Amino acid sequence: MTASTWTTGGQVRYEKYSLAGNTFLIVDETRTPLPDDATRSSFARWILDPYFGVGGADNVLYLSHAPGGGALTFRIFEQDGSETLSCGNGLLSAGHYAARFLPEVREPSGEARAWTFLTEIPSGRPRQVRVGEGFDKGCMWVNVGAPRAFPETLYRRDTDLSGRVPPTASDGPAEQQNLLEAELAVDRPPQNFLLDGGPARGEAWPDRFTGHLVFNGEPHLVLVGAHGSPALGQDLFAPAPTQNSIDLMEFLGARINLRHKETFPEGVHVNFVDLTGRTPRYRTWERAINQETLACGTGALACAHVLLARRLVPDGPVTMRPHRANWHRPGTHLRVTPGPDGLVLDGRPAHICTGTVPSRQDLPPRQDLPPRQDLPPRQDLPPRQDLPPRQDLPPRQETPQ
């Protein structure tokens, strides 16, 4: 399908993928090129709309040939039509798609069953990441490299996160790993947000969280533990889904972003990590989407990086369990493996279905109703004819007994 067929009423094919509860619609622009970014944005807004579009997905992923060949450009658009930088689970899903439908595209080194993707397109400095097939059937891996310094456009270092305590760089090896420690003020949720515990029981609510900032293609704030409020951890990591637990996570992610908008002008992903079980569990509230997702690939990478750098888990591969996804499918996990050239994320993308839709612009134009035809002038009825005066009936005659 060519660009001309798109602009003259052509259909757009998409592939739906899911990984750990993250869902994506992949549009292959090597076969269906779109004319411009305005079209990509409006198409994403429409197709991701759960009421007037297709819905049922977190993002649209656009894949196209990178300049010079030998690589694929990876672009990710949000539900509001904006473009974001990167996505770990999205890259794994895109790699799975490339393995099935674009086997001719290899990374420049020619390594079998591996591909190079250009990410972080909106930054103006595209970054190469490698995606490949694992030894286990259906397993994909992506090497996003080591965490990097926060871009100035995403994090203003001169702002005061807490109102009292400015962010401070971690000392020692952590600083060399671009791990920034910061304290930030938090708002107390309404009393009815929590379950039977927490502030509703009189437990003190922390006025500050101590977290770590990690940039691995996306900006992340990682918060480990209960921050002095055991009920907070119990509520966030409840064993079964509850509306209060969902609402609490939504409140914390949204309020942290709102209160610290000056520090994070384009938003920050908010991750909570629990270490009370055998395997680390995490939950991620995502910027741009402005809500929690069932899982987050770059979130798993950021959380594992903090745990490894702070020696909170043994060296070696770290299994991260997205807690929200485990409510629906127990055992769901992602694995993060440290290596000499960065962190490697692996998981099992699942191809859900194939669909074909028109672009939003290709929908038939609205058919306006014909102009109203005014009714003919009212024909006045003839004057009312008054009825003759009532004739009183004769008096009732009693029936003899």
Annotated model-derived regions:
Residues 166, 200-201, 228, 375, ...:
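Polar low-complexity intrinsically disordered regions enriched in Ser/Thr and small residues
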Residues 143, 151-180, 196, 235-261:
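Aspartyl protease catalytic domain
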Residues 170-238:
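Internal active-site segments that recognize and position negatively charged phosphoryl groups
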Residues 2-137, 147, 204-205, 214, ...:
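A glycine-rich beta-to-alpha transition motif near the start of alpha/beta enzyme domains, typified by
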Residues 142, 149-167, 171-177, 184, ...:
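C-terminal domain-closing interface element
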Residues 44, 142, 153, 182-184, ...:
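Generic low-polarity alpha-helical segments
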Residues 363-399:
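Long, intrinsically disordered low-complexity tandem-repeat segments
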